[in-house]
Amino acid sequence: MGRDGKGDAWKYRQWRPHGLSGIPRNYTERKLKVEPQFPFKKVYITPYRLQRHYADDGTVSYSELKRNLEPTGIKIFDDFLQYLTAGNSDLQVFADRYGLKLTDIDSMIFVLTGMRGIDFRKKYQVWMAGQLLRWSDMSIAEVAKRSGLGSPNNLYLTFKREYNLAPGYYRKAIRKPGDVGKYKL
């Protein structure tokens, strides 16, 4: 029993700043003792399907973009990557599809990438949102939905946290002439 007679659970019920409510104060980050088998950039699947090309006479055409939809060869992980690429974000729904627990999915992602499942998902969503902002003329709301972040507010908060920029300013900073329309969904 703890000093208040309630056991040790009282430690985890203390007030915490917003965003840390599910992480105990004594949480220690897990780390792989070896290099992850699959670095993030090797497993990311772009949402774009077509790439723009210019002919010698100046006409524009689009061809199928070569995308590796199974970058790891591990079926369940490749399915998970495709699930995220489709703009889905609920890890529990994905776990239920396979009859697994959320901790099973989290452990799989950790073993393969060295990242916690929720951190991997967030990085995937931010990376996809960045690509959508750069290469498309989608509205902020469409980018938020397509990337799996859900709402424009979530997109804004995530980009402020990651880049210290609002999504619209990020788009202006990253985009170069000719970027819009280079790829199509």
Walk through the language-model features, giving the residues of each.
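Short amphipathic alpha-helical surface patches that serve as generic macromolecular interface elements
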Residues: 123-126, 140, 156
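Short hydrophobic/aromatic patches on the structural cores and recognition surfaces of FHA
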Residues: 105, 129, 155
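Alpha-helical bundle regulatory/interaction domains
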Residues: 1-85, 91-92, 96-104, 112, ...
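Short, intrinsically disordered/low-complexity patches at protein termini
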Residues: 128-130, 158, 175-181
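Pre-recognition alpha-helix immediately N-terminal to the DNA-recognition helix
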Residues: 72-79, 121-131
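Residues in the recognition helix of alpha-helical DNA-binding motifs
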Residues: 108, 112, 120, 157-162, ...
